[in-house]
Structures are given as C-alpha cells and as structure tokens.
C-alpha cells in the first residue's frame, strides 16, 4: 500500500505528533502495520458517514485517529490526524 500525505496533514503531524516521542513512535508503528494491512483488527479501520462520507479512519491510540481516503486499490491519502473530537 502506497501512502501519501496531504499538505495539511504534514502541518498537523508536525504540530501534534512530531515533538511527542511516545506518540511519534506509536504513529510510525501503526503506519507500518497500515501499509501492510489497512484492515488489521488492531487499527479498527472504519468507513465514515455524514459530512465525512467517502473517507475512512483508523486508530493510533484510544483517542488519536487518522482520517484517510482510498485513491485506488494500492494508494491512500492521509488527510487529518488528531483526537476523536478534533477530526470528526
């Protein structure tokens, strides 16, 4: 699975994850798993509804989610990352 980042995602990553070493390590561990199997039960990947219809989400931690979009069978675009209340 090829993973690309939306420009806005890069800014959010730098702001919320980059300087938190524990969350940063967890993020990259989860991203490795996601790139191998985006529907691993550990990720709790799910389709979104309502105003976010067409997008998907998976969990980094209990409260931290990544919002993404499937571009095709082999590519995804990361859109947002943050707490449940921030991204939904």
Task: Kindly label every feature range from the protein language model.
Residues 8, 53, 83:
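Residues that form or immediately flank small-molecule/cofactor binding pockets and catalytic motifs
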């Amino acid at each position: 699975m090829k993973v690309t980042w939306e420009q806005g995602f890069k800014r959010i990553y730098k702001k919320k994850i980059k300087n938190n070493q524990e969350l940063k390590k967890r993020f990259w561990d989860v991203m490795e798993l996601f790139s191998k199997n985006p529907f691993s039960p550990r990720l709790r990947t799910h389709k979104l509804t309502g105003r976010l219809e067409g997008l998907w989400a998976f969990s980094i931690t209990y409260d931290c989610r990544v919002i993404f979009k499937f571009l095709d069978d082999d590519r995804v675009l990361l859109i947002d990352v943050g707490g449940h209340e921030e991204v939904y």
